[in-house]
Amino acid sequence: MSKVFKKTSSNGKLSIYLGKRDFVDHVDTVEPIDGVVLVDPEYLKCRKLFVMLTCAFRYGRDDLEVIGLTFRKDLYVQTLQVVPAESSSPQGPLTVLQERLLHKLGDNAYPFTLQMVTNLPCSVTLQPGPEDAGKPCGIDFEVKSFCAENPEETVSKRDYVRLVVRKVQFAPPEAGPGPSAQTIRRFLLSAQPLQLQAWMDREVHYHGEPISVNVSINNCTNKVIKKIKISVDQITDVVLYSLDKYTKTVFIQEFTETVAANSSFSQSFAVTPILAASCQKRGLALDGKLKHEDTNLASSTIIRPGMDKELLGILVSYKVRVNLMVSCGGILGDLTASDVGVELPLVLIHPKPSHEAASSEDIVIEEFTRKGEEESQKAVEAEGDEGS
């Protein structure tokens, strides 16, 4: 059974059908956006039917645009004339889903295929604060369809249909070795140093899974290690319009294991950074959020060698920090404790899903309709022809 996403314009004359809303960036290639647009022939008449793909970077509030300030920059716009079809842009082979939709929807349905370029950023949303209004900042993609004499013509909101999609990356097929780091700290009045080593078994980890952090301590000093603290930081670089950098802690936990003077310690700790623990943090980077759908922490940005980082708009990375609180003793006790730490790079991303071909010719349509200012959705099973 094939699932299809449908969105209809406010005037009811145009509908877009897409087989999915997440399109995978394989670093060197990007999945094409293939779908079908259904149009009322009386509404189309002698005009042209267009489908447009836009990648935009939004970095300000909607309400400020009313006073002439624009906080949106279109990074990429691709316009395809669907009706009448242009000979310079011939339609390639239809996908199985397009063939099924054309058979179901009738003669007023037209296929389209949009191809993203490889140097575009992935979908990222910066989480707004409780007082923020309007659309959140970030990178978003949308597919839009409208009827006009030319693509530059101004079209009213009720006369076009648009559907937000996401560009996502999955874990690379070949991951590198697990990162490791170590440090040596010497203390006054201690002949031998304190050695801390931390490592992870693999470089790439998936959203929601426990991350195993291995810690080895060789404490040859006369100091006592009172506790071990492990944290995960998300680093977001906004490189398109400024050099802003935001660091948000998405996981932190203190472990009460103590390491006595002149002793050794080795243990593996499980840490799991998830959005639920940081859901109120303003500016936290999330995977581009589609309305009505849960999201998660933004995936690490994977960059093709030689790629211009500035074109990506927002770069996301993670690091694991392991810190030891070393008691210096004396009458002040823990007030004079020293901090010894190391950092490990972390790649946090989604696993590559397994694609299973749909064996049934049935199509389930998930339709998005507008209710007031909110959008709601309903799943509708299409049994028979629709929209002609």
From Swiss-Prot:
Phenotypic consequence of L80P: In MYP26; uncertain significance
KW Iron (keyword) present: no
Tissues where this protein is expressed: Inner and outer segments, and the inner plexiform regions of the retina.
Residue runs in coiled coils: none
GO molecular function, one term: opsin binding
Primary location class: other
GO cellular component: cytoplasm; photoreceptor inner segment; photoreceptor outer segment; synapse
Record's keyword terms, sorted: Cell projection, Disease variant, Disulfide bond, Sensory transduction, Vision
Domain of life: Eukaryota
Biological process, per Gene Ontology: G protein-coupled receptor internalization; signal transduction; visual perception
Location in the cell: Photoreceptor inner segment; Cell projection, Cilium, Photoreceptor outer segment
PROSITE patterns: ARRESTINS (PS00295)
InterPro entries: Arrestin, Arrestin-like_C, Arrestin-like_N, Arrestin_C-like, Arrestin_CS, Arrestin_N, Ig_E-set
Recorded family membership: Belongs to the arrestin family.
Role according to the record: May play a role in an as yet undefined retina-specific signal transduction. Could bind to photoactivated-phosphorylated red/green opsins.
Quaternary data: Homodimer; disulfide-linked in response to retinal illumination. Interacts with CXCR4; the interaction is dependent on the C-terminal phosphorylation of CXCR4 and modulates the calcium ion mobilization activity of CXCR4. Interacts with GPR84.
Recorded disease: Myopia 26, X-linked, female-limited: A form of myopia, a refractive error of the eye, in which parallel rays from a distant object come to focus in front of the retina, vision being better for near objects than for far. MYP26 is characterized by typical tigroid fundus changes commonly seen in early onset high myopia, and an unusual pattern of X-linked female-limited inheritance.
Protein name, as recorded: Arrestin-C
Originating organism: Homo sapiens (Human)
